[in-house]
């Protein structure tokens, strides 16, 4: 089986920075058509404005917590590339939780951003994959990859909301994998350890001790760069993983 994604069409959310940006760049470099989605239109323009003149890359700015925005993203992808083969749900947010504050809304905010956005986009994209595969009697119709975190299993008090949302995303991955298997659509997740994303950069600025703590509890003794983790996502997107679904691959050093 091949690791190639050449000629495939992918939607990558969270593609304005960090891991989502690294995944989108690798996919484009490997010959895929890529629709880069994010809420930060200015950053999308900075990262992808020049590339969007190339026929293989487009970008879409919008709040994917809104269902109409999700529908518009899928429509824009079809208008640009006529199909969608791969979805990477990479849009994530990390905020702290005060477990004893009854006014704290972080759990509901993170469930909406990190779980429900991925679920709704998965539903829309899966419906499109099924429709475009109506005349394809065999072979996979699509691959969906959710970006999770080892916080789903290993947490700390202030990350309670993020951990709950990550665990829910992983269970959604397993459930959707079962629901879509008969449609020949695979659904998997990659759970990352410490990756120097924009959100982690902000966190270690506020909590300087976190950097040393992360390094001390990571056997390889360092924080990964986004570019180190993109091959696993490409593996799950490609035919090389055609008999893998419902799995959560952990990459944590």
Predicted regions: what they are:
Residues 122, 165, 173:
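Active-site helix of classical SDR
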Residues 98-99, 103-111, 159, 214:
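Substrate-binding pocket helix/loop in short-chain dehydrogenase/reductase
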């Amino acid at each position: 089986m091949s690791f190639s994604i050449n000629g495939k069409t992918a939607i990558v959310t969270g593609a304005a920075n960090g891991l989502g940006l690294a995944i989108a760049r690798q996919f484009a470099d490997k010959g895929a058509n890529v629709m880069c989605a994010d809420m930060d239109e200015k950053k999308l323009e900075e990262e992808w404005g020049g590339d969007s003149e190339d026929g293989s890359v487009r970008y879409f700015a919008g709040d994917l917590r809104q269902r109409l925005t999700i529908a518009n993203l899928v429509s824009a992808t079809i208008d640009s590339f006529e199909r969608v083969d791969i979805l990477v749900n990479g849009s994530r947010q990390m905020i702290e939780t005060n477990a004893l504050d009854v006014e704290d809304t972080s759990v509901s905010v993170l469930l909406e951003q990190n779980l429900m956005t991925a679920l709704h986009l998965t539903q829309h994209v899966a419906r499109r994959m099924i429709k475009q595969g109506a005349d394809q009697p065999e072979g996979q119709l699509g691959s969906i990859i959710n970006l999770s975190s080892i916080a789903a299993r290993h947490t700390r008090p202030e990350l309670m909301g993020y951990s709950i949302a990550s665990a829910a995303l992983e269970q959604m991955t397993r459930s959707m994998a079962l629901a879509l298997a008969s449609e020949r659509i695979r659904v998997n997740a990659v759970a990352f350890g410490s990756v120097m994303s924009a959100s982690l950069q902000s966190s270690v600025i506020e909590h300087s001790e976190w950097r040393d703590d992360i390094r001390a509890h990571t056997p390889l003794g360092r924080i990964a760069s986004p570019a180190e983790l993109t091959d696993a996502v490409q593996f799950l997107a490609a035919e090389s993983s055609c008999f893998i679904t419902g799995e959560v691959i952990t990459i944590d050093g």
